[in-house]
Each structure stands twice: as structure tokens, then as C-alpha cells.
């Protein structure tokens, strides 16, 4: 009898019809070749802060931080408050820090690949004034690496550790505090 009760209970649980929601993040193709197939990654996400300062002051602080970090600016749209560069290269060091502090391209036999690869970076910043007088700063940092020791000219997707974005936004706040 106990066995029959257990089987009835187990079958009732199995047919309860629970639905599982798919929470897998949507990925986009970023590279495709015959050798590697299609590489997928998450879409780049902006890191944002809100500061208690007018957008015009924040805009000047952002420009100052780009110059301080020696990041060449090619997108400079004051009307839309957009600033940055969608394709610049750095090797070994970024903003005075070792590249592997900010970028993860995986590891090879000699250590982190970000320390020896040429890193191509897209860094774009948007400054938006809010109705309450604060300003939102959103910055998007997307690194890709290229092995310069071999004959390959292909760039591979790299990840961000999140530390660069934090340093960048912290320096904006520090510049505003001066």
C-alpha cells in the first residue's frame, strides 16, 4: 500500500505542468570564418552612474578624463552629448595600468593574452541631463584582441573585467569634485 501511495504521489508531481522560463541571455554573432565557425557573445552593455552636476559640467569632465587617459577622441557630438572612439588600439598598458587588469582575452602558455596582444577598443560615452538636475553618464567599453606575434590579422572578442569602466567613471566624479 505504501508503495502504491508513493507511486501515485510521484506521478502527480511529474504531471503538475510547471513551465520553465528561458532565461538564457540573447547572444549576437560577432565573428565568422570557415575555420572557427560563428563566435557569439553578449551584446555590449553600458555602465552608468548618476552625478549631482549639470550635464554641461559633466561633459567637460568626460572630455578631460579622455585626455588624461590618452584616449583619442573621434566621436565628439556636443549636441547629443556623445563622446568617444569606436576603434583605437593600445598594447600592454591602458590609463597607466596593465592591460590585463581591464581586458580578458583568455590565457596562453605565457600568461594572460591581453598582456601581449594588441587590444582594439571601442569606448563610447553618453551624457544625459535629468529633470531633477542630476546627470547620467553611460560608458560602453568593448575590447578585441589581435595576436601580433603571428601572421593572423583576425581580431578575437575579449571580455571586460569591469575595472576600466569603474576607473573611468570614478575619474569623472573626481574631476567634478575638483
Where in the sequence are the language-model features?
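Sec-dependent bacterial lipoprotein signal peptides
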Residues: 1-13
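Ser/Thr-rich, low-complexity intrinsically disordered terminal regions
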Residues: 14-178
Amino acid at each position: 500500500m505504501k508503495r502504491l501511495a508513493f507511486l501515485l504521489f510521484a506521478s502527480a508531481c511529474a504531471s503538475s505542468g510547471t513551465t520553465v522560463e528561458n532565461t538564457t541571455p540573447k547572444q549576437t554573432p560577432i565573428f565568422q570564418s570557415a575555420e572557427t565557425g560563428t563566435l557569439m557573445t553578449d551584446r555590449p552593455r553600458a555602465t552608468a552612474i548618476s552625478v549631482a552636476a549639470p550635464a554641461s559640467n559633466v561633459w567637460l569632465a568626460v572630455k578631460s578624463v579622455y585626455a588624461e587617459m590618452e584616449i583619442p577622441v573621434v566621436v565628439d557630438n556636443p549636441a547629443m552629448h556623445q563622446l568617444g572612439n569606436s576603434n583605437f588600439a593600445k598594447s600592454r598598458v591602458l590609463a597607466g595600468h596593465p592591460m590585463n587588469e581591464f581586458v580578458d582575452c583568455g590565457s596562453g602558455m605565457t600568461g594572460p593574452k591581453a598582456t601581449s596582444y594588441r587590444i582594439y577598443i571601442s569606448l563610447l560615452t553618453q551624457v544625459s541631463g535629468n529633470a531633477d538636475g542630476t546627470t547620467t553618464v553611460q560608458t560602453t567599453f568593448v575590447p578585441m584582441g589581435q595576436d601580433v606575434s603571428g601572421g593572423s590579422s583576425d581580431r578575437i572578442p575579449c571580455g571586460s573585467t569591469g575595472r576600466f569602466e569603474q576607473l573611468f567613471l570614478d575619474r569623472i566624479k573626481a574631476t567634478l569634485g575638483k
